[in-house]
Amino acid sequence: MKTVVSLGQIDAIVLTAGASKRLGEPKALVDIHGESLIQILIRKLKGKKLRIIIVTRVELFNEMEKLGEKVVINTNPESGRTGSIQCGIKELESERCLIVPVDRPGFSNATIEKLINLEKTSCPSKNGRGGHPVILSKEDCEKILSSNPSTPLRDIINPVKIEVDDEFLHLNIDFPNDLEKLRKITIEHDL
């Protein structure tokens, strides 16, 4: 981790390094009514004054760089999501961070607000089932850095579950029909 700028500042690590094989196109770049999914997430996170770190694969670097945020390449994205999180943690300027997978956009602004005001590693939960994004404590950031990049995050940390009302918390963009559902939801709801 880099030198801490402010104890109150929180960085958001947006994960975009996945291969998107099931969807057939890069999830970060899918069009949602004239805006890419990554643009929607950045706007939502910037609204909470979070510093953005985008972790991506080499093939998407140029597109991600156009967004004007800090971009880091995971040179081995096949190793798993934890490896991408490690890449982002190494660039932190805050002690805590919010982990935001690009394919899990169903959280509300109220959920972000709840999470960034918590000190312990926590995640939103709907009906007892945890979701994303996840806020990481300084201690858990250090645990993740010392872990194998292929170790699933759930085997490294144990987030406190915070029950939220987000109807679409568990929306996961993996297949074309998920994308159509997201497009419909964004018209009908404030995501």
Question: What feature does the model see in each segment?
Answer:
Residues L7-P124, G130, K161-D166, D190:
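Nucleotide and nucleotide-moiety/phosphate-recognizing core
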Residues E91, K143, I185:
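Active-site catalytic microenvironments for nucleophilic, acid-base chemistry
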Residues P105-G106, D140-E142, L169:
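Short histidine/acidic/glycine/proline-rich micro-motifs that form metal-
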Residues V100, P133, L171:
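Glycine- and other small-residue-rich loops at beta-strand/loop junctions that grip anionic moieties
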Residues G106, I135, N172-I173:
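Short aromatic/basic micro-patch
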Residues K2-A12, S146-L191:
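Conserved alpha/beta core of the MobA/IspD/sugar-nucleotide pyrophosphorylase nucleotidyltransferase superfamily
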Residues I112-I156:
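Flexible, gly/pro- and Lys/Arg-enriched active-site loops
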